[in-house]
Amino acid sequence: MDKNICAPCAPMGWNSYDYYNTEINEMQVRANAEYMAAHLREYGWEYIVIDISWYEHGSGSRSGEYQYLPFAELEMDAYSRLIPVTERYPSSADGAGFRPLADYIHSLGLKFGIHIMRGSPRLAAHRHMPILGTDLTADEIADPANICSWNPYMYGLRPDIPESQLYYDSLFELYARWGVDFVKCDDICREDASTAHAEIGMLHKAIEKCDRPIVLSLSPGPAKITEAEWYAENANMWRITDDFWDSWPLLKDMFRRCELWQGKKRPGCYPDCDMLPLGIIGGCFGDRKERVTGLTEDEQKTMMTLWCIFGAPLMLGAEMTRLDAETLKLLTNRELISLQQHGERARQIMRSDEQAVWTAYDPQQRRTYIAIFNLSEEERGINCWINQIASSEEGSYRGQTLHELWTGRETVPHAGGLAALIPAHGVRLFWYSNN
């Protein structure tokens, strides 16, 4: 099965982490899925992804001390595979796993995803639990010196032992039976562990064998640009940054990362800028103080514009059931979503500490887009010259009317190019028709 078939366009969806951390339950997943189906599905949003710790008993019980409990009791089946805890996912009882929840999400016209950690549970190794289809136990395929630096749940696997591949095969056979459409694998993308490179390939092989199209997302970043082709051969998304939050310095730094990764997107293969910290977030972290995103309105538009013109996946992090009207409007701009889904030839024209310019072509709309970003701390006038932007492929905007996406205004460029007055941390996104 061609892995790219399951993600011909950059995925769009929701991930539970930014609000719920390790604590989301089935009722909350269903509520967010129902909201997406009612308000976002028609615009292309489709994935509902449960992030980390859906298998951990007592998750969040000591959140003031630990994000991930040391020596936590993890729920497993007889073959060392993590399964949902029934106290948070009651429909998973009696061995049903995530199948009932996935069926419900599919009934809404959506797709279902889960988060996993690289490797196999340390608890399974300690208990010498069996590996399906082999004579080995979990301790025999695990590398006890290969532990994630920030999460204590798992051991990395030994690529030199064929049974390690069989363990991953058994995982994805289980996920396929559950009806999983998307898997985010953590502690793997930036290849901190010596086995991470090989384990990326093992995950891909397991998906190929499971006879179900499953999007594979690798985390956390920063991904290695030298591994770009390896990611593209084996995964659909790979994080180019560590966790992204609602901070202007992090957003400004994303321009550097996108510059590095421009030209690496193709159907089924997407450099990933991480989740969109919009709306209400942070409700289940240490201090339990949820917050409205710290990004200003202009910064939110800058983020959405950069993600979409670059062609990154869109994964919302908010508690969706409490989205305000302005955030919902931001997430349902059909023109911007078309650019994210269908855009081609995205390239950075220039970048300095104070400004950046990107362009891309959307064949679906037959439009060329020009995004001018003000990265400085004050309102500025920024000029772009025709010879910087127009190419023979895209045609010239000389003499054409330019339409501004965010305001709906029209402008005609001056003889030498385009001038725009842009607020601090803001953006003007122009387009012209190639008809």
Where are these regions (language model features)?
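Mature N-terminal, pre-catalytic/accessory segment of carbohydrate-active enzymes
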Residues: 1-19, 23-25
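Catalytic cores of secreted or luminal carbohydrate-active enzymes
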Residues: 302-350
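C-terminal beta-strand-rich structural cap/linker in extracellular carbohydrate-active enzymes
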Residues: 413-435
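Structural recognition of the beta-strand scaffold that forms the well-ordered cores
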Residues: 11-16, 46-51, 111-116, 181-186, ...
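Active-site beta-loop-alpha junctions enriched in small/polar residues
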Residues: 17-19, 53-55, 117-121, 188-190, ...
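Carbohydrate-binding surface patches
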Residues: 301, 307-310, 315-317, 351-393, ...
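Glycan-recognition surfaces
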Residues: 140-146, 158-160, 166, 170, ...
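Aromatic-lined carbohydrate-binding/catalytic grooves of carbohydrate-active enzymes
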Residues: 37-176, 180-190
